[in-house]
């Protein structure tokens, strides 16, 4: 049974967040956490927070099942564009340049590995 966590209106551009999301797509949760901890991208903190929330949601939905991070994997992760705040910057000769402050919505779905690999 899968679990989902959504982080809405994150003040980061979707393009920057998608770079970090691509790092953990399809990976086991313990490996994804290690990747995010060692990432230098600012968006990795938000992805880590949402991933931990998804793991907690999985534990909440399956109270009688005890699973570790090795048995869970990131099934899907995607970044949608959120609201865009439009600001103006004064420019020469009485003009104004438009600044678009973008935001995004991050969705992470985790699930249990069907056939876990044992070492």
Swiss-Prot record:
UniProt xrefs under InterPro entries: Ribosomal_uL22, Ribosomal_uL22_bac/chlpt-type, Ribosomal_uL22_bac/org-type, Ribosomal_uL22_sf
Assigned keywords, A-Z: Ribonucleoprotein, Ribosomal protein, RNA-binding, rRNA-binding
Example of a GO biological process term: translation
MF annotations from Gene Ontology: rRNA binding; structural constituent of ribosome
Keyword Ribonucleoprotein included in the entry's annotation: yes
GO cellular component, one term: cytosolic large ribosomal subunit
CDD domains noted in UniProt: Ribosomal_L22
S-S pairs: none
Pfam family for this entry, one: Ribosomal_L22
Oligomer status and interactors: Part of the 50S ribosomal subunit.
Protein family per UniProt: Belongs to the universal ribosomal protein uL22 family.
Known role: This protein binds specifically to 23S rRNA; its binding is stimulated by other ribosomal proteins, e.g. L4, L17, and L20. It is important during the early stages of 50S assembly. It makes multiple contacts with different domains of the 23S rRNA in the assembled 50S subunit and ribosome.
Protein name: Large ribosomal subunit protein uL22
Organism: Pelodictyon phaeoclathratiforme (strain DSM 5477 / BU-1)
